[in-house]
């Protein structure tokens, strides 16, 4: 019994590290990661050269959210298409038991890597640009990244093409920007709840902190739930193997 449990544990650990290695070095993820880090370093250097530190809200978007969205888009675009191109998707569907276990492993590895990269960007921002609560920066940015990655994963299973999914996701993200701008122009609508990109550091000066925290909670809970829905529908699309093989 103990031997079986031990073998299962080491098998899962081996699979985990194998997936990390594939994500890092298969395709061009490591190139995107290096470019994202270079982008953050450039932002730090420019701030010191011009003696003009980036405002905290800009740090949230420019140094954390935008590069993370690009990395999340790339990873989720290649999650299914990489297996198709390398003719390994058949093996994933042929795993004894539920194939969802393998896909959930792959999604978990993807989000684990994205989380650690998000931590890296937050630490760079904290130590070299602005003081802020790191856990607030990471958690609020990562919820948005989680939702976008699952949206792109779902669209990849829908279109059977990572590039079509990536383009569609970019269109949707742009539409969400326009939607927020439109709702912000209507005084009777509280656009805070509908701002997909809401920053925790954008609190209006005259708003009570408890009310602001409540708005943030509702906003991020909604975004996280939508991300879970996209993940569910993406996994459901993978139930039918024929379109993917």
Residue ranges and their predicted role:
Residues 142-182:
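A structural motif at transmembrane helix-loop-helix junctions in multipass membrane proteins
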Residues 78-111:
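Helix-loop-helix units of permease transmembrane domains in multi-pass membrane transporters
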Residues 64, 125-157:
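Alpha-helical transmembrane segments and their immediate interhelical/interface regions
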Residues 99-132:
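Hydrophobic alpha-helical transmembrane segments that constitute the membrane-spanning cores
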Residues 1-33, 242-244:
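Aromatic- and glycine-rich beta-strand/loop motifs that create alpha-glucan
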Residues 58-82:
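Long, hydrophobic alpha-helical segments
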Residues 46-53, 171, 175-245:
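Terminal transmembrane helical anchor/hairpin motif
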Residues 38-45, 114-124, 171-181:
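Aromatic-anchored segments of alpha-helical transmembrane domains
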